[in-house]
A protein has these predicted regions:
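Residue-level recognition of tetratricopeptide repeat
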Residues: 74, 108, 142, 175-178, ...
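Register position in tetratricopeptide repeats
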Residues: 78, 112-113, 146-147, 179-182, ...
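N-terminal leader/linker segments that initiate helical-solenoid repeat arrays
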Residues: 18-71, 291-306
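Canonical tetratricopeptide repeat
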Residues: 71, 104-105, 139, 173, ...
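Helix-start (N-cap) detector for alpha-helical repeat units in TPR-like alpha-solenoids
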Residues: 62, 66, 100-101, 134-135, ...
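Short coil turns that delineate tetratricopeptide repeat
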Residues: 63, 97, 131, 165, ...
């Protein structure tokens, strides 16, 4: 059923992409399409309370206690309580260090807050413990990208992409990293991959948006029309607004990028990297704007002295 809905969505976007200019202008949104922000479920709250009670028992083995800390940390993470999740994950690792999934999650946390060296170490630990963990490969490449180590990021992401060229998210992140070195060539490469590998998988819609193969208005309308469940709409809009923000940022439209990253955050899809990395994107943009402002002030003072 999920595949069918995605196929319908892709067909809708393909059809709207062929609409004439007057139809497109009539479909512009006065306000950005939204979903109701996700809220913690009763099940999540009950599981956190249950695990907290069980962890108070003194007769638990280290193996069981480590597993419970991991489970409670995962629930904390799913409702946005990341500092509490991180504490639980660290406690779980103290009891059982051989947990690659926890190292991967900690690496994402470190990336989000800009602690890149710690992120690299966490992802390296994940890959050492689980060499086939493809999420850690991608996440390490992304951490290297945000940490400014573009050559290493490109090497990692190229290898990751080549392992599954039909994965649209691998294509997207390869493009984002390539664009740091050669924007025009990166876009041409993405266009080639899009024409060769695209399918009904949802992620290729995001590639089409990145390439402007479909207008933003038509894409958002198709997403709204083709998505019934609020949670699914929140997930898709989180991804859409993040990659729209990244596209606008790469094109130099920083003001729009800031607004779109804020929209990506607003749906509370805490376990999506697009939600997590929107915070990092905003922090890096604000840091750069502050540096630019200070540089202008310094230049102005230099002119006054002269």
């Amino acid at each position: 059923m999920k595949w069918f809905q995605t196929a319908i969505l892709c067909v809708a976007i393909a059809l709207t992409g062929c609409a004439n200019t007057s139809q497109q202008s009539a479909q512009k949104w006065l306000y950005p399409p939204m979903a109701v922000p996700l809220q913690p479920s009763v099940q999540q709250e009950v599981q956190i309370a249950r695990l907290s009670q069980l962890l108070q028992r003194p007769d638990l083995s280290d193996e069981v206690r480590a597993k419970m800390h991991y489970e409670r940390g995962s629930y904390y993470d799913s409702v946005g309580l990341r500092d509490l999740a991180r504490l639980d994950f660290n406690q779980s690792l103290q009891l059982n260090p051989a947990q690659p999934d926890i190292f991967n999650l900690l690496g994402v946390y470190f990336t989000q807050v800009g602690e890149f060296d710690a992120a690299y170490e966490a992802f390296d630990s994940t890959i050492e413990l689980a060499p086939d963990n493809t999420y850690a490969e991608r996440n390490r490449a992304i951490a290297l990208y945000y940490g400014g180590r573009i050559d290493l990021a490109l090497e990692d992401m190229t290898k990751h992409y080549q392992e599954m060229p039909t994965d649209p998210f691998r294509s997207l992140w390869l493009y984002i990293i390539e664009a740091e070195q050669n924007p025009e060539q990166a876009k041409a490469n993405l266009q080639q991959r899009y024409l060769r590998d695209r399918s009904e998988e949802w992620g290729w819609v995001l590639v089409a948006i990145m390439l402007r193969d479909v207008s933003d208005e038509d894409a958002l309308k198709a997403i709204m029309d083709g998505t019934r469940e609020n949670y699914r709409l929140a997930e898709r809009l989180t991804e859409t607004y993040f990659y729209l923000g990244k596209r606008n940022q790469l094109e130099g439209d920083i003001a729009s990028a800031i607004s779109l990253y804020k929209l990506a955050i607003s749906f509370n899809v805490y376990d999506y990297v697009e939600h997590r990395y929107s915070f990092l994107e905003l922090a890096q943009i604000y840091d750069q704007l502050q540096q630019d402002r200070l540089a202008k002030l310094k230049a102005a003072k230099t002119l006054e002295i002269e």
